[in-house]
Amino acid sequence: MNPLLQDYARILLEWNQTHNLSGAKCLSELEPQITDALKPLEFIKDFKSCLDIGSGAGLPAIPLALEKPEVKFILLEPRIKRAAFLNYLKSVLPLKNIEIIKKRLENYQSPLQVDLITSRAVASSSFLIEKSQRFLKDKGYFLFYKGEQLKDEIACKDTECFMHQKRVYFYKSKESLC
């Protein structure tokens, strides 16, 4: 793991001791989550902007932003302590490419148009698509980090679902919604 990702993991574990931002108690529990956040870089198309919905403790957005410093990331996180954590990360790590917005997706009003919309453990895929597609460019993609429950949430083609261990990555183009 690169040193910046190690710094992120260390800071998250420190904050977890008092703020319970994630279930991870040690680095060996957090490393697979960071690897999981980065895995889609192996198969998704290049992107220049990303909206992460329900950023929480920063997964997947922070590892992605650290690996792709040329990409603009907008992190939507309504909860105060999680937004404070994300702002702290921005102040101590080289994360000039992120903007943190303390709002729920349903309350976020913006002319924003991004190439990629990500989300991990937030809501059903159909809800996320319905509420966020207005922020996605016509040639953009949704990337949702899901589990086996994906098949109960939404119909998806084999070309839209990628598996790695217990994770299902749902990767769907906006164009295919029509």
Swiss-Prot record:
InterPro entries in the cross-refs: rRNA_ssu_MeTfrase_G (IPR003682), SAM-dependent_MTases_sf (IPR029063)
Enzymatic class: transferase
Subcellular location: Cytoplasm
A Pfam family the protein falls into: GidB
EC number: 2.1.1.170
Gene3D superfamilies in the record: Vaccinia Virus protein VP39
Disulfide bonding pattern of the chain: none
Transmembrane intervals: none
NCBIfam families: rsmG_gidB
Main function: Specifically methylates the N7 position of guanine in position 527 of 16S rRNA.
Protein name: Ribosomal RNA small subunit methyltransferase G
Organism: Helicobacter pylori (strain HPAG1)
